[in-house]
Regions:
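Short, solvent-exposed loop/turn segments at secondary-structure junctions
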Residues: 11-14, 39-42, 58-61, 108-111, ...
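Short glycine- and hydrophobic/aromatic-rich loop-to-beta-strand nucleating segment
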Residues: 131-137
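GT-A fold catalytic core of metal-dependent nucleotide-sugar glycosyltransferases
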Residues: 83-127
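Active-site-proximal specificity loops/subdomain of glycosyltransferases
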Residues: 38, 42-97
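N-proximal low-complexity "stem/linker" segments adjacent to membrane-targeting elements
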Residues: 1-20
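Short beta-strand/turn micro-motifs composed of small residues
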Residues: 8-10, 35-37, 105
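Short, acidic, metal-binding catalytic loop of nucleotide-sugar glycosyltransferases
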Residues: 22-32
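Catalytic core and acceptor-binding pocket of nucleotide-sugar-dependent glycosyltransferases
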Residues: 143-185
């Protein structure tokens, strides 16, 4: 089983600094990166060996998300995906099944040697901000966002407003209320 995969969903053109992000990802060869989006990746090829691009339209991703829930989800623009990040373990569970941990990452997060900063204790969740959060990849933990304590994912996924579900008022608070081990820097 591999240790960690980090997921990013991005739509539109990658920013000018994306090549720097790719270089920082390449330097973290023990971590895989899954990129979902509709961007033209050809000018960045060949991608580093640990970076995988999954071409998907925003509409197809919305359809995939909707298919996993029994209520209408609201996802008017790609930026709203920040509230769906805690559900990536559930939404992409087939893609990440061979990893011990999964996380979400923003492509404006230029990495140093990330593995040096990963705690060696057994936490269910690492870090507290949306640009980089890591979760233990278990069936229960990947559905933790659905727990009744803290923000209600149904309300979060049913509004066009950004609720910061991926950060302090969302998942960090939920894990704290559920008394689940997390490392929040």
């Amino acid at each position: 089983m591999k240790k960690l995969v980090l997921i990013s969903a991005y739509f539109g053109e990658y920013p000018d600094y994306f090549n720097l992000w790719l270089k920082s990802a390449a330097q973290n060869s023990g971590i895989d990166f899954f990129l979902y989006g509709d961007c033209d990746i050809s000018k960045y090829e060949p991608l580093p060996q640990n970076v995988y691009f999954f071409k998907i339209s925003f509409q197809d991703l919305k359809n995939k998300i909707q298919s996993r829930f029994d209520f209408p989800v609201i996802l008017p623009k790609p930026y709203k995906l920040c509230d769906y990040k805690p559900a990536y373990g559930y939404l992409f569970e087939d893609d990440i099944k061979n990893y011990e941990y999964w996380g979400h990452i923003d492509i404006d997060t230029i990495l140093g040697d990330l593995e040096k900063f990963l705690p060696h204790k057994d936490y269910e969740k690492l870090y507290q901000f949306g640009h980089l959060t890591i979760y233990k990849n278990t069936y229960k933990n990947n559905r933790r966002f659905m727990e009744n304590r803290g923000q209600d994912y149904r309300k979060v996924f049913s509004t066009s407003f950004i609720t910061v579900f991926d950060e302090l008022p969302g998942m960090t608070k939920k894990f704290k209320l559920l008394n689940i081990p997390q490392y929040a820097s």
